[in-house]
């Protein structure tokens, strides 16, 4: 998962919100798995995360929350999100993540990280609402 900087996720009133937790392990090529909840209005939708990236080493756990922009239809949330960036975590850290899928949905996330991890990578992550195909 490509994390960089310490950006703040400031949501507009029309944005959906997201909370997630995930794990990332890597030796050159990394694997990410996790779960979260998408909040749109008064509705909560659980989802899963799977994917990975290149050029990283170590392991970390992360938890975060942020904004989902340009979500015209709920099914537009499903898909592959891309991000480019890097992170370095030793013990604890805070980082920002910005990613976009092919339908123009953007996620801006602030995450707290734990572990020993170093990356400069391109990440490809699949977000899938539970119960959807």
What are these regions (language model features)?
Residues 1-7:
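C-terminal segment of classical bacterial N-terminal signal peptides
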Residues 9-133:
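Small-residue-enriched, tightly packed secondary-structure blocks
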